[in-house]
Regions:
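Iron-sulfur-associated redox domains of electron-transfer enzymes in respiratory
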Residues: 1-173
Length: 173
């Protein structure tokens, strides 16, 4: 593309960098934990439905946290009950899928993490043997501590994301 457009990088003037997506939300931080994707998504669902950001306990869906292989919860947002499941490991995902097929269970939203406990136990993490529950809990709690300290707790609070929606996509939802 550069050759085609005859752009010579050496002759370009220095300028500031494009900070697009240079900031993140704490919702992205908790993606590393089992239930973190669900929790971040539920925060956004709350924002979309109420047109305001969640506060207090609505920022911390503790019922879906932890390292259990299968977690279920019913979350009430805007008078609507949402049945959710969080699954750790593909073996348990297979079991839950079979239950869904057999109409034994129903969920509105399911999060599946291949690594038990979430990415905190994944291949990209420092390997400590044995990787026990205590270590997983410490990693998980560190991410939740970081989440709690941040000012931008929902993706839609991120000024870069707001700019993208304002200028390209329109309203979220």
């Amino acid at each position: 593309y550069l050759k085609k457009e005859k752009i010579n990088l050496a002759k370009l003037k220095n300028s500031g960098y494009n900070s697009l997506l240079g900031k993140g939300s704490s919702g992205g931080i908790i993606f590393g934990t089992s239930g973190g994707v669900m929790e971040a998504t539920l925060r956004e669902v709350y924002h979309i439905l109420y047109k305001r950001y969640p506060k207090g306990r609505l920022l911390n869906f503790k019922s879906i946290r932890g390292t259990s292989n299968v977690k279920e919860a019913v979350v009430k947002i805007n008078g609507t009950y949402i049945k959710v499941a969080i699954i750790n490991g593909t073996g348990d995902a297979r079991k839950v899928i079979e239950k869904i097929k057999n109409k034994e269970v129903y969920y509105d939203f399911i999060e599946v993490m291949t690594c038990e406990g979430g990415c905190i136990s994944g291949g990209g993490q420092p390997r400590v043997f044995p990787l026990n529950k205590n270590l997983k809990d410490k990693r998980m709690n560190a991410l939740y501590k970081s989440d709690k300290r941040m000012k931008i707790r929902c993706a839609s609070m991120n000024p870069d994301i707001k700019d993208i929606y304002d200028n390209f996509f329109g309203e979220v939802g």
